[in-house]
């Protein structure tokens, strides 16, 4: 990464740099409304903007400590506090959105690092098996905690009653299918960790329909490239670019070897450029 530039391309909101087509931030698929900002003597119509209240779980850390439930619920509490305290009068669109939607985005980092550490290829069926179970659990516990907050405060996000949570449709696939490990390798990774069942989802469905949900948005996978280095992690849930990444900031160059890199797992850090996509 070199110098940073900001520009606006009206048609596609994308631009070409050094032969690469680049776009704006895309981890947030969230309601955004255009406000009507008028002259000083006219009244403005303020609608909802987007505030990225983001955080990421370190997959390796929560898996090795067998604390997916605890980490997820603590993260939702922390992110919810950020949303609640982000009361910016000078940016009324953000204030309105936070007050009405309480949106947060809990994501994850270090997927490739965790897989490589456990000798699992990123493209393998074991990797897909792991992701199906892990992110189902993050979804379950983040939703459960959001329901608990709504119950504790007696408050849901605005228009909850119009949502798929309220009519129960959101839960259809979870109450009809068990999301459990299918491969022996992944079964061993989740050994000693309780995995929510169809019955747990059915119970959560009842609780959500009764008490509501506090956060209109709960999960979002952020790119967290720089923050992943601080956490000794691979970035986000994406495959690595190289076993030793090189980043340039102005006049400084940083070399970052992938976490847990050894002679034994070297070939499990397959570059994204070499993968069949």
Stretch-by-stretch model annotation:
Residues 1-24, 226:
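Internal intein/HINT superfamily modules and their associated LAGLIDADG
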Residues 1, 25-277:
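Long, C-terminal-biased catalytic regions of enzyme "large/alpha" subunits
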